Structure formats: structure tokens, C-alpha cells
Amino acid sequence: MKPHPHTSEQRHKSPSVCINAAIRRAARRMGQIYDDAFEECGLRATQYSLLVQIDRVGTPTMRVLAEHLVMDLSALGHTLKPLIRDGLVELVVDERDRRSRRVHLTKDGRIKLEEARAIWKKVQLSFDDAFGKDGAAQLRSTLDLIASPDFSERMTIVFHSIS
């Protein structure tokens, strides 16, 4: 008797037809890998990404930070809460626009970021070794393109041109 064509083994081997599902599944898997690695320093992968972005942009407004992370403001607020609670970041009033809040990395936040950065480097090297350096570089480039506003615009135009 032939095995059913949709056994879990065959599903695992077959490529995803839906690019959205494939990207989300890969993102969840990578998120699990990074979460497991960051567990020793008490952060989640999303929290590490936030700390890095805050450090890069340097006291961004909530809106600017959300745009950099391609997140909505409510999701950003939810993700920031434990970092604020733990004293790693603080919200400060924008001097130019008192209605806006800026996200500031505290001294403890900088210390935690450096601790986590060492773990991040180890995971990055592990990924490059497991995936192959050239493949990893190409994947990063492709994902950066997909995450860009230009690609989003292009997709919208193409979507509306298909009848």
C-alpha cells in the first residue's frame, strides 16, 4: 500500500507553496532558537531586537522605533513593558513635542545589551556555519529587501494590477 501523499514526513520535505506561511514558520523557528540562547541573560529575542534598535537610533520616539521594527504602536508598547519594568529602558517626554515619548536605553539596559550581544554573536556564527556563509548573506539580503518599504509599495502595485 502506498503512503498517503500528505504524511508528515512528506509535508516536511515538500517546499511551502505560500511564501507568507514559509517566512512565518521560519521566523518562529529562528525566534525559538534565539529565545533559547538569550534565556541565560533573561531576555527574549524580540526584547534584544528592541534594545539594539534603541541603541542604533539613539532615544527614538515610539513611532520612529515602531517604524524601524515594522511593528504597530500597541505591539511595541506591549513589548516594551517588561523592559521598562526591569529598568532597561525608560520613556521620557520629547522636549520638542510634549505629547510624544522617547525611548531611552538606561545604564542597566546598556549593560544587558552588551551581555546579550555576546550571545547574539554566538548564535549568528552558529547560523552562518549551519546554513553556509554565502547562503546566510544572501538570505539576509533577501529578507532586508522583503522588509523594505520599497518592496511593500511594489507588491501593492503588482497586486492591484493583477485582474
Residue locations for each model-derived region?
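N-terminal leader segment of winged-helix/HTH proteins
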Residues: M1-C41
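C-terminal regulatory/oligomerization modules of transcriptional regulators
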Residues: M1-R11, K133-S163
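Short, locally clustered residues in the helix-turn-helix/winged-helix DNA-binding domain
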Residues: R24-A27, V52-R56, R117, D144
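Charged, amphipathic alpha-helical coiled-coil/dimerization segments
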Residues: G31, T59, K81-S141
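Residues that mark the N-terminal boundary/hinge immediately upstream of a DNA-recognition element
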Residues: R44-T46, T61, T106
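Central "turn" residue of the DNA-binding helix-turn-helix
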Residues: G58-T59, V70
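The alpha-helix within a helix-turn-helix
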Residues: A66
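Helix-turn-helix DNA-binding motif, specifically the short coil turn and the N-cap/start of the second
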Residues: D72-A75
